[in-house]
């Protein structure tokens, strides 16, 4: 399970060191793709394959489903962490997420998110007040 908040630096070559506690779960390969709110999502390869299979089962006659599948496939990059646990983020991914040297990696249970540190701080400030209400509304039937 991916949990917690980490603050690795992005180096000049576009490499980001993944948190050590997640490296074993990602050692078999990982998929980096664009996500909501101009962040990046990092999935273990097996989890991403499940997501892609589910997405590909949608009707190809549905324009939204086709667009989603196209964007998902086109925006995804397979990575294998190096010996230091670093992955190289593509220029397109860095641009999409407006990544500076200061990054934040957050656990999102079954995947990781990569954010620019300033964007993550802004996101948190904008959503902090709604956290309790969202918890009540969203999780009412689960918890």
Swiss-Prot record:
Primary localisation category: cytoplasm
Keyword DNA-binding: yes
Gene3D superfamilies: Transcriptional regulator MraZ domain
Pfam family membership, one: MraZ
SUPFAM superfamilies, alphabetized: AbrB/MazE/MraZ-like (SSF89447)
UniProt superkingdom: Bacteria
Molecular-function annotations in GO: DNA-binding transcription factor activity; transcription cis-regulatory region binding
Compartments where located: Cytoplasm, Nucleoid
Protein known as: Transcriptional regulator MraZ
Species of provenance: Mycobacterium sp. (strain KMS)
């Amino acid at each position: 399970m991916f949990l917690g908040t980490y603050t690795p630096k992005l180096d000049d070559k576009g490499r980001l060191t993944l948190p050590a506690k997640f490296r074993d779960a990602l050692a078999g390969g990982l998929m980096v793709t664009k996500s909501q709110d101009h962040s990046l999502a990092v999935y273990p390869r097996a989890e991403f394959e499940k997501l892609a299979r589910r997405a590909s089962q949608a009707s190809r006659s549905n324009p939204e489903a086709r667009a989603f599948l196209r964007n998902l496939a086109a925006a995804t990059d397979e990575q294998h962490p190096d010996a230091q646990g670093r992955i190289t983020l593509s220029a397109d991914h860095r641009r999409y997420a407006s990544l500076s040297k200061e990054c934040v990696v957050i656990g999102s249970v079954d995947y990781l998110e990569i954010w620019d540190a300033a964007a993550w701080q802004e996101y948190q400030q904008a959503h902090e007040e709604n956290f309790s209400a969202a918890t009540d509304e969203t999780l009412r039937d689960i918890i």
